[in-house]
């Protein structure tokens, strides 16, 4: 694109900077060899405007950023509504985006008019992708990374809106040029003076547009002196420029250089032997280079063969990897299916954890009570104390059995009975403390491990489900994007078809007009009517002959088709008889 290469300010033969307009130059300054790329900073609204004609203007442009943002936003919205209709984002969303995704969607809709299949890379940074595209298109100002952070900020987003507005202008210019390409390429060749005049006019228009973008408010004001100053500078530049004098100097410098080269050739007349030696040496170097090239070609062929073998092995490994991956996916699907069939819900797992914690508290209370009772002397003081201890033991045993039945825990131990004397009471307490309590703790710990396993399994299942949902949502978004892109492509194709139809209709109207003109000419000349009548008679005779031949051909084809139908019927009868014979043979064999 224009502006990709760095302009070096190339000099002419006499050292003067060229003012020729080339694709690698911008209309910046015609008085020197300075380049646009020397300073990459965009001129601020508070800095003096750069003049095309080497006259400094110290007036300060007004900081009317709101009107600029409003104009650019309306321009972008109208463009998207014109080409995208209902798919276009709202003007409020263009002016104040909610994030980078809104800006990316707007940029894709606009840039796809230049590149139909363009889609923003998923893992690419917006600062690098968008800035690189605008730089390649020749946008005259750099887009800093701070303009994107945060998106929609007052310090950077006006620059991005201005860039999108410039991109819309490029699209409209590109479409206009593509529609009038024939006149641009094959128009009349202009004379040198006319071409120079048009070149200067184009330079003046470019500089005027640049000043207009820097200070739109002053340019749009009818009472402003902007246009008078611009015309005065243009008139002054025409008066100061003298192209004929420059052409004379250029021709003189070219003649001087040619004379210098002729003198060098005359000076080298006596060095034929050295030149021949140099030529032979160069031929020897060429021969060596050819030998080296042949060696490299042999090496290249050998490497290509090895590369083909490596690629075949790689394809085999890839196919094996795909098979293994498919087996792994099948196993994962089976595991997921088993989890869905034999698993528990999250609510049941939480309820089991609560019950487990309550059981732990009850067991701890029982353990503390047993420890306290084991420290007592177990000396019977009277009959009332024994009854009290017996009732406590029976109540504790009943509570333990209720808890175990509620937890659905089976104890394969000797049941606890009511003690009859002090010795039985002591033995039962020791049995409860040493046998029942450890067994209950062991089973509760096992139940805890089972619950933790179920919980981890359900957490893995939830993570897998979230990943699957995310993949499906991404797939849905991609499908929506593809559908929208296909719809835009179809709409563009319909527009192109409409344009083609319009051109065909215009051509048809032209042909009708030409036909009318020819008919008028035919009426004026009677000989043409006679020729037309003769030609019509010949055409009618030819048509009758054609009809007769066609009827003869139809009759011949119909006869051939009848014969083919008869032969097909005979073949079908033979086929049926053959099937009957085969059925008889099968029955005989069976």
From Swiss-Prot:
Short name of one Pfam family: Ndc80_HEC
Gene Ontology terms: cellular component: cytoplasm; kinetochore; microtubule; Ndc80 complex; nucleus
Consequence of changing residue 51 to A: Rescues embryonic lethality and chromosome segregation defects in single knockdown mutant
Compartmental location: Nucleus; Chromosome, Centromere, Kinetochore; Cytoplasm, Cytoskeleton
Cystine pairs: none
Any one GO biological process: regulation of cell migration
Keyword Ligase belongs to the record: no
Entry protein name: Kinetochore protein ndc-80
Keywords: Cell cycle, Cell division, Centromere, Chromosome, Coiled coil, Cytoplasm, Cytoskeleton, Kinetochore, Meiosis, Mitosis, Nucleus
Alphabetical list of PANTHER family matching this protein: KINETOCHORE PROTEIN NDC80 (PTHR10643), KINETOCHORE PROTEIN NDC80 HOMOLOG (PTHR10643:SF2)
Organism: Caenorhabditis elegans
Annotated signal peptide: none
Function text: Acts as a component of the essential kinetochore-associated ndc-80 complex, which is required for chromosome segregation in mitosis and meiosis and spindle checkpoint activity. Plays a role in kinetochore assembly and recruits the checkpoint protein mdf-2 and the spindly-like protein spdl-1 to unattached kinetochores. Mediates the formation of end-on kinetochore-microtubule attachments through recruitment of spdl-1. The ndc-80 complex synergistically enhances the affinity of the ska-1 complex for microtubules and may allow the ndc-80 complex to track depolymerizing microtubules.
GO terms, molecular function: microtubule binding; protein domain specific binding; protein-containing complex binding
């Amino acid at each position: 694109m224009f502006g990709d290469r760095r302009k070096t300010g190339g000099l002419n033969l006499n050292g003067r900077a060229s003012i020729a307009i080339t694709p690698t130059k911008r209309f910046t300054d015609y008085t020197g060899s300075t380049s646009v790329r020397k300073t990459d900073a965009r001129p601020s609204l508070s800095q003096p405007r750069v003049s095309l004609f080497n006259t400094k203007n110290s007036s300060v442009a007004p900081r009317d950023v709101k009107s600029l943002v409003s104009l650019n936003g309306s321009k972008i919205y109208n463009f998207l509504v014109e080409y995208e209709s209902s798919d276009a984002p709202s003007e409020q969303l263009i002016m104040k985006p909610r994030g980078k995704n809104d800006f990316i969607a707007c940029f894709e809709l606009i840039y796809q008019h230049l590149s139909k299949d363009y889609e923003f890379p998923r893992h690419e940074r917006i600062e690098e992708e968008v800035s690189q595209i605008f730089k390649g298109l020749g946008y005259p100002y750099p887009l800093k990374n701070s303009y994107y952070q945060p998106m929609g900020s007052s310090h950077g987003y006006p620059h991005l809106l201005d860039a999108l507005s410039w991109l819309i202008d490029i699209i409209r210019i590109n479409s206009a040029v593509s529609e009038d390409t024939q006149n641009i390429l094959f128009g009349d060749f202009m004379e040198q003076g006319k071409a120079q005049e048009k070149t200067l006019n184009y330079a003046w228009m470019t500089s005027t547009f640049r000043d207009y973008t820097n200070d739109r408010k002053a340019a749009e004001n009818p009472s402003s002196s902007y246009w008078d100053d611009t015309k005065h500078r243009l008139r002054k530049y025409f008066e100061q420029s003298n192209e004929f004098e420059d052409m004379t100097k250029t021709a003189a410098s070219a003649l001087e250089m040619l004379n210098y080269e002729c003198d060098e050739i005359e000076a080298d007349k006596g060095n034929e032997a050295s030149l021949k030696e140099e030529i032979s040496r160069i031929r020897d170097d060429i021969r060596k280079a050819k030998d080296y090239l042949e060696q490299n070609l042999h090496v290249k062929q050998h490497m290509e063969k090895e590369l083909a073998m490596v690629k075949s092995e790689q394809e085999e490994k890839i196919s094996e990897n795909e098979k293994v991956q498919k087996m792994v996916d099948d196993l994962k699907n089976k595991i997921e299916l088993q989890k869905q069939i034999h698993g528990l819900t999250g609510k049941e797992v939480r309820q089991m954890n609560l019950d487990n914690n309550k059981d732990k508290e009850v067991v701890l209370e029982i353990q503390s009570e047993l420890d306290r009772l084991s420290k007592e002397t177990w000396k019977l003081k009277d009959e009332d104390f024994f009854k009290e201890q017996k009732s406590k033991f029976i109540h504790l045993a009943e509570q333990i059995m209720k808890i175990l039945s509620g937890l659905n825990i089976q104890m394969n131990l000797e049941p606890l009975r009511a003690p009859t004397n002090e010795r039985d009471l002591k033995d039962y307490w020791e049995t409860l403390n040493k046998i029942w309590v450890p067994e209950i703790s062991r089973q509760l710990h096992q139940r805890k491990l089972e619950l933790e396993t179920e919980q981890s399994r359900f957490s893995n299942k939830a993570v897998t489900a979230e990943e699957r949902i995310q993949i499906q949502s991404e797939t849905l978004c991609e499908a929506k994007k593809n559908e929208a892109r296909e719809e835009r492509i179809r709409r563009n194709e319909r527009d192109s078809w409409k344009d083609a139809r319009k051109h065909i209709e215009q051509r048809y109207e032209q042909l009708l007009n030409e036909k009318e003109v020819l008919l008028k000419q035919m009426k004026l000349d009677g000989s043409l009517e006679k020729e037309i009548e003769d030609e019509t008679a010949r055409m009618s005779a030819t048509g009758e002959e054609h009809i007769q031949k066609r009827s003869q051909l139809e009759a011949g084809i119909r006869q051939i088709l009848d014969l083919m139908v008869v032969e097909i019927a005979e073949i079908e009868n033979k086929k049926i008889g053959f099937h009957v014979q085969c059925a008889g043979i099968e029955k005989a064999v069976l």
